[in-house]
Design a protein with these regions (language model features):
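Sec-dependent N-terminal signal peptides of Gram-positive bacterial secreted proteins and lipoproteins
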Residues: 1-26
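Exported/periplasmic ABC-transporter solute-binding proteins
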Residues: 21-70, 86, 106, 114, ...
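Short acidic/histidine-rich motifs immediately flanking catalytic phosphotransfer sites
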Residues: 48, 96-98
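Signal peptide-proximal N-terminal region
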Residues: 67-79
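Short, well-ordered coil loops that connect the C-terminus of an alpha-helix to the N-terminus
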Residues: 75-76, 98, 192
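Ligand-binding clamshell of periplasmic/extracellular solute-binding protein-like
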Residues: 82-89, 98-113
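Active-site charged/polar residues at nucleotide-handling catalytic sites that mediate phosphoryl
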Residues: 95-96, 210
């Protein structure tokens, strides 16, 4: 049936282009564009969709990886859902269709992993498919043209800083930030300066717009937004490494392509793209 539809669509395309030859100017162009759009839609419907839920901090890198993966797998259409890892995990637990999950922290993946002892959902990942994909860094960032002479995390507890943007407690970047500031002993002192964002992209946006003096985000987001990194967190002051685990959902309706995508994420081509955006390969 799909083949029949494609043949009809192609016939329609050639017919419309032929008719368009008799038209003039913009009318002919419009006919060709409309026909091409219809054919593109038919071709898209012929592809199998693979739904990937991924941490918001991976937006730029995975969008580029999508193009490379689809070149090698022309029968697959990658569909992304980017948000905070906590939000994505909740959506999966509530039954949202998802084939692959990539979190910005182990916590959210553990809550879907039947072998972790922390699982809190009926839906779950396939633990055999789980692996640590990437590592990131927690940084203090300001606008490139900021007039504030902020140079360190310690400056957050001075008059240099009036407003700070952090991710909220449900967001991995917020959890990393809170553990860092508590371990530094300045969390309680600066709480009144903090504005909380729903995910790392919102925090990054506030810094870029100058809505806050500074913010704590991943190095990859600072780089993508053209922000100035003034300090990087001491790893010993974080409760855990900033690790991005990936896994296939047990209920995936497209397991074969999900496995292909997981494999592609480990390829040299994907690693090159991740490194371009500032990610490190997880050890």
């Amino acid at each position: 049936m799909k083949r029949y539809i494609r043949i009809v669509a192609m016939s329609l395309l050639y017919g419309l282009v032929f008719v368009g030859c008799g038209a003039k100017g913009n009318d002919a162009k419009d006919v060709k564009v409309d026909a091409k759009t219809e054919l593109d839609q038919v071709n898209k419907e012929d592809k199998k969709s693979l739904t990937v839920f991924a941490a918001a901090s991976m937006t730029e890198s995975l969008t580029e990886i999508k193009d490379e993966f689809e070149k090698e797998n022309p029968g697959v259409n990658l569909v992304f859902n980017f948000d905070s890892s906590g939000t994505l995990k909740s959506q999966i637990a509530e039954g949202a269709a998802c084939d692959v999950f990539i979190s910005a922290a182990s916590k959210q993946m553990d809550e879907l992993d039947p072998t972790s002892g922390k699982k809190d959902s009926d839906l779950e990942i396939d633990p055999d498919s789980r692996f640590n994909l990437l590592e990131n860094e927690v940084t203090l960032a300001v606008k490139e043209d900021s007039s504030k002479d902020i140079k360190s995390f310690e400056d957050l507890n001075t008059n240099l800083v009036e407003t700070i943007a952090l991710g909220n407690a449900d967001v991995p970047v917020g959890q990393y930030s809170e553990s860092l500031l508590k371990n530094m002993g300045i969390w309680d002192a600066i709480k009144g300066k903090i504005t909380f964002g729903s995910n790392v992209k919102e925090v990054t946006s506030w810094i870029s717009e100058g809505a806050v003096d500074c913010g704590i985000i991943y190095s990859t987001d600072a780089k993508a937004a053209g922000l100035k990194i003034v300090a990087k967190a001491d790893p010993t002051l974080l409760d855990k490494k900033v690790i991005y685990p990936a896994a296939v959902l047990k209920d995936s309706k497209n397991r074969e392509d999900a496995d292909k995508f997981i494999s592609f994420l480990n390829s040299d081509k994907a690693r090159e793209i991740f490194e371009k955006y500032g990610f490190k390969q997880a050890e």
